[in-house]
């Protein structure tokens, strides 16, 4: 029987990336070291990494027909990512972002044109055949709709034997109040450093202890804190930590968080422990920071 897939639900966007030797001053005219088009978006990037790691994966997100979508779909296919779940929209434009990557320190500055393209709805998600997937990862966006999607998975899982249940993870990256209802869903919840700092926490460990009461019974909460590494807190109350694995030189951090999330999911889906998954996530994300793009992370 064919191995089940990992489905990532969220954003795909065209990233137009300018690599510069130093961040430009306002109102100046300068050359970049290189420029490339790259498929971006959190869930989309996580699919790229999962595929590079050897997982069978699929992407679900919104696209509008046109040249940009053609490029993005071709790139998904080149990476071996299944795009049969894409929600094609009759209105709106495919989103695009301009990214400045500073080659001297790896910083990335993103200016997103988040267009009028509708997000994937609970109605779109009703068409998904849940029997095809062993894991579904949801990037927090239109949370009220995503709660309905997560409830559908919960209802499905309630009818399945343990080995047939779909495992679920959720990412809460943006400090938007609407997204915080997603803490209560999924067996793995990724909360970003940005959200943790927005809520007044000064370290990953402090954030996990302060936010753990929001997750559902038995879930694990994970927080990556850039060069400080990452922490996880599960139902046993033991705080796990992995140091970061910085490359010899940081050149591109665009998508590092998505790389971490995907690597943790991949490791857990293979039956590894949370400590092993946390370490693996930090290792692969660290390697990515030393490379332009994603090629070469494995």
Curated annotation (Swiss-Prot):
Activation and inhibition: Requires potassium. Inhibition by ADP.
Enzyme class: transferase
Assembly and binders: Homodimer.
GO MF annotation list: ATP binding; fructose binding; identical protein binding; ketohexokinase activity; protein homodimerization activity
One cellular component term from this protein's GO annotations in UniProt: cytosol
Residues involved in beta-D-fructose binding: 15, 41-42, 45, 258
Pathway in which the depicted protein is active: Carbohydrate metabolism; fructose metabolism
Tissue specificity statement from the Swiss-Prot or TrEMBL entry: Isoform C is most abundant in liver, kidney, gut, spleen and pancreas. Low levels of isoform A found in adrenal, spleen and brain.
Catalytic activity: beta-D-fructose + ATP = beta-D-fructose 1-phosphate + ADP + H(+)
Binding residues annotated for ATP, in chain numbering: 108, 226-229, 255-258
Keywords, ordered alphabetically: ATP-binding, Carbohydrate metabolism, Kinase, Nucleotide-binding, Transferase
Gene name of this polypeptide: Khk
Enzyme Commission designation: 2.7.1.3
Keyword rRNA processing in record: no
Source organism phylogeny: Eukaryota, Metazoa, Chordata, Craniata, Vertebrata
Free-text function comment from the UniProt entry: Catalyzes the phosphorylation of the ketose sugar fructose to fructose-1-phosphate.
Alphabetical list of CDD domains matching this protein: Ketohexokinase
Keyword Ligase part of the UniProt annotation: no
Protein name: Ketohexokinase
Record note on modification: The N-terminus is blocked.
InterPro entries in alphabetical order: Ketohexokinase-related, KHK, PfkB_dom, Ribokinase-like
Family: Belongs to the carbohydrate kinase PfkB family.
